[in-house]
Amino acid sequence: MLPVYEEAHRRGLPVLFHTGDSRTDFSTPRRLMNVIQKIPDFTCIAAHLGGYSEWEDARRELSGTNVYIDTSSSLFAVTPEQARKSIEHFGVDHTMFGTDFPMWSPKEELERFFALGYGEEDNRKMLFENFARLFRLAE
């Protein structure tokens, strides 16, 4: 897959990775870091707050990279404090709201997201501004 990632990078396209889930080694944050080490300024999205059920590994492995995270399939599994820890680690400017629809109800995911207690400006960034910037929709 490395040639695909290199071409996406050459074209300025971010790639979304399913990250986490300790039931398999295929999607660990470490695996994503292996790609980033080969393409150092690679822009990608690590789904599920960087690594479903492997959030500490995600924060350790993916620090200092151009990784964005999303909130999909995670907010039901962590406390608001744990979610905030990951969001603040990667930065509000590198976090995007996600639902993993149709697996989860968008309405319930939004309720969980708003329960995190961020202010209007941060919510606006995570709900759409970061996505628009990353995918150059605002240009």
Q: Which ranges hold each PLM region?
A:
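Catalytic pocket-lining loop regions of alpha/beta-barrel enzymes
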Residues: 1-96
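Mid-to-C-terminal alpha-helical segments outside catalytic/metal-binding sites
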Residues: 91-94, 107-139
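Short, solvent-exposed coil/turn elements at secondary-structure transition points
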Residues: 50-52, 75, 101, 119, ...
